[in-house]
Each structure stands twice: as structure tokens, then as C-alpha cells.
Curated annotation (Swiss-Prot):
Pathway(s) annotated for this protein in UniProt: Protein biosynthesis; polypeptide chain elongation
Predominant subcellular localization, coarse grouping: cytoplasm
SMART domains on file: EFP (SM01185), Elong-fact-P_C (SM00841)
Similarity field: Belongs to the elongation factor P family.
Identification of the protein by name: Elongation factor P
Ranges in coiled-coil conformation: none
Gene Ontology cellular component terms for the protein in this record: cytoplasm
GO biological process per UniProt: peptide biosynthetic process
Source species taxonomy: Bacteria, Pseudomonadati, Pseudomonadota, Alphaproteobacteria, Hyphomicrobiales
Record localization: Cytoplasm
Length: 188
């Protein structure tokens, strides 16, 4: 489907020169003089190479047809990550470069959204929040509860984040999958 460059957004998949690209950032720039342009940074799906393109906002760009489906995460092995479609029980293998930096947040039986182009996974979307356990942090110090500063902590998935001073080892917390930031104590 052909669309104008100014309508491209993060997460769209573009077809260019016979290859698919996932849009990482898309910014419309309106200089004081000259023609407005769309600055688009994207990653080639086939090999992970990042490129940056600049289009006039009125240029036509080919946006690929993408289908989103819910899949359940099963396991990870040397070949990649394995998911199952809950509707028809088909299993699909997703390469590590498609999963990218969200891999530590994948948990067994987690439902994720996979974006498919001609039945090939091109992008993954995790739930916004995930519950993890603190496995390493500084001990709780009395009298620090009113402080707004965070202390470093290691989570059960191996990711480091900042947590409030009252959080101790063994506490289950909710973090954002986008950036790993602390949200709240888990309510379970």
C-alpha cells in the first residue's frame, strides 16, 4: 500500500528495493526555508542493518501489509525464540534479532503480539508491564523511606534497574518492558 512519507510512524514496516524495513523513528522536519522532509530511521529485517532515509513529506512510500496475532511464548534455544499461536496451535520460530532487547522480559506462557509479513515474524510487542523478583540490592536502611532517590537492584531476569529504598531482596516488583524502569510493588 502506497502512503505519503509524512504518515509513516514508529513500528510501521516499509518495503524498499525489495527488502522489508521496520521503522525505528520517524520525524517530520519543517525547516524555516525549503521543503518539509520526513527523517526515518529503520532496521532491515533480513540482516538487522540500520539505515536512515530522508524523504520529502509528499513522497510516496510502500508500506508492507502486516498482520498482528497473539502468540504464547514457549521457550528459547540456540535457534531463537519459539511461540505458539493460541488460535490454531501453529508454532513459529522468531530469530534473536527480531526479539532484540526485549528478550530478558519474555516469560514462559507470556502472551505477546507478533507482527507477521507473509507469515514471517518481523516485530514483537510485549505487555507494557511485567512482574519480576529483586535478587540483589543494598539492604533496607531505617529512616530512608521518605527519600526520593533510587538504589540499584538486579532483577530475576538479569536486568539492572533502580528501586526505592524500601525494596528488599525477594520483593516482587512491576517494571516497564520498554525501558526496565520501576513502576510499583507487585500486588500478588
Amino acid at each position: 500500500m502506497r502512503v505519503i512519507a509524512s504518515s509513516i510512524r514508529k513500528g510501521n514496516v516499509i518495503e524498499q528495493d525489495g527488502k522489508l524495513y521496520v521503522v525505528l523513528t520517524a520525524e517530520n522536519i519543517h525547516p524555516g526555508k525549503g521543503t518539509p522532509v520526513s527523517q526515518i530511521e529503520m532496521r532491515r529485517i533480513s540482516d538487522g542493518v540500520k539505515i536512515s532515509e530522508r524523504y520529502k513529506t509528499t513522497d510516496q512510500v510502500e508500506r508492507a501489509t502486516i498482520e498482528d496475532h497473539n502468540f504464547t511464548f514457549l521457550y528459547e534455544d540456540a535457534d531463537g525464540f519459539h511461540f505458539m499461536n493460541a488460535e490454531n496451535y501453529d508454532q513459529v520460530q522468531v530469530p534473536k534479532d527480531v526479539v532484540g532487547n526485549v528478550a530478558p522480559y519474555l516469560q514462559e506462557n507470556m502472551v505477546v503480539k507478533l507482527s507477521l509479513h507473509e507469515m514471517v515474524p518481523v516485530a514483537i510487542t510485549l505487555p507494557q508491564r511485567v512482574t519480576l523478583e529483586v535478587v540483589e540490592t543494598e539492604p533496607v536502611t531505617k529512616g530512608q523511606t521518605a527519600s526520593s532517590s533510587y538504589k540499584p537492584a538486579m532483577l530475576s531476569n538479569g536486568v539492572r534497574t533502580g528501586v526505592p529504598p524500601h525494596v528488599a531482596v525477594g520483593t516482587r516488583i512491576v517494571v516497564m518492558t520498554e525501558d526496565g524502569s520501576y513502576v510499583e510493588r507487585a500486588k500478588d
